[in-house]
Regions:
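N-terminal Rossmann-like NAD(P)+-binding domain of SDR-like oxidoreductases, especially those catalyzing
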Residues: 1-170, 175
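Conserved donor sugar-nucleotide recognition element shared by glycan-biosynthetic enzymes
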Residues: 151, 155, 188, 253, ...
Length: 334
């Protein structure tokens, strides 16, 4: 793998901070653009690395990419666009106009700047929430019908459609499974992480939609999967969509609870057969394409994620895990 100059928008976030570390380990030059909405402590460890550069900027600004690039270094080869408002609760909290501004218009803005700079490829983080459940109950794949059931998913589809219509930098789209695991900026508003936190601190869990299936992926494996998009043959990769996860990561909520009970057997679990909130996903996803075309296989399991989360909480490595900064929607509306 040859050294590349890669721009990561949202690089101080949950996925971005681990992706930055992974890219630096691979020998790449990394420029992170982030407005530091959730703080910048996740980036501090990189500042002594000569291949790391940081710019505080908002991706909605017209020259945010152009003005963020370090001087006297080659132009970027790739932009990995992670920045935006992530998750249906956060998007609901700020409304459609703001969601479109940050998730659709900002994507267009960064892509247009990348095109003007002669960037070769543009990797985009989307979500598997865009799918409708299959009619036969089987797993959905990249060709399955789209049926967004949240404002967040709607905004991701709109951004995807824009990117796939462009002729500039080759867009490569990754529809991420639900992420879990520890990172420099951990989130506790995601299913596995939130379940473990509530089980550990409250010794009880209240579970809605117990039999609903979802697909899960460890945040470290997300970083690995995105990095595989850097070396896919350019013309073959252009406009491709990849579900990013693994078949082994398809779990029901009941199965996740069983993994938690294995490590916290004293907890009390209460089930309610209600459809609760705005996120009604009950879906199984196929990840054959990313395994076949990019060679991706997950290295960590949901059980690994539960283990590391319990350990981090028991040892006090995460102080005040109920702080709003660990939850996208709560922090944004403060």
């Amino acid at each position: 793998m040859s050294e590349k100059h890669i721009v990561v928008t949202g690089g101080a976030g949950y996925i971005g901070s681990l992706l930055t570390a992974h890219l630096l380990r691979l020998g790449h030059r990394v420029t992170v653009i982030d407005n530091l909405l959730f703080g910048g402590e996740s980036l501090l460890t990189f500042f002594s690395d000569p291949n790391f550069y940081f710019s505080k900027a908002d991706v909605t600004e017209k020259r945010s990419l152009r003005d963020s690039l370090p001087r006297n270094v080659p132009k970027p080869d790739t932009v990995i666009h992670l920045a935006g408002i992530v998750g249906f609760p956060a998007c609901q909290a700020i409304g459609k106009q703001a969601t479109w501004h940050y998730n659709v218009e900002a994507t267009q803005n960064i892509y247009e700047q990348a095109a003007g700079l002669g960037v070769e490829r543009f990797l985009y983080a989307s979500t598997y929430s865009v799918y409708a459940p299959s009619t036969d109950g089987g797993p959905v794949n990249e060709e399955s019908p789209l049926k967004p059931e949240s404002l967040y998913a709607e905004s991701k589809i709109a951004a995807e459609e824009y990117l796939r219509s462009q002729s500039g930098p080759a867009p490569v789209l990754f529809r991420l499974a639900t992420v879990y695991g520890i990172a420099p900026r951990t989130r506790f508003d995601l299913v596995v992480n939130q379940f473990v936190l509530d089980a550990f601190t409250r010794r009880e869990l209240l579970i809605y939609q117990r039999g609903y299936s979802r697909s899960f992926i460890h945040v470290l494996d997300v970083a690995r999967g995105l990095a595989l998009g850097l070396d896919a043959p350019l013309e073959k990769a252009r406009g491709q969509v990849y579900n990013l996860g693994s078949d082994e990561g398809n779990y029901t909520k009941d199965q996740i609870v069983a993994l938690i009970i294995k490590r916290l057997p004293e907890i009390i679990v209460e089930y309610k057969n209600l459809t609760f909130g705005g996120d009604k996903r009950d879906i199984t996803v196929s990840f054959d394409k990313i395994r076949r075309e990019l060679g991706f296989t997950a290295t960590l399991t949901v059980d690994d994620g539960v283990r590391e989360l319990v350990s981090a909480l028991k040892t006090g490595l995460i102080r005040n895990p109920y702080d709003e900064r660990y939850r996208n929607a709560h922090f944004i509306v403060q």
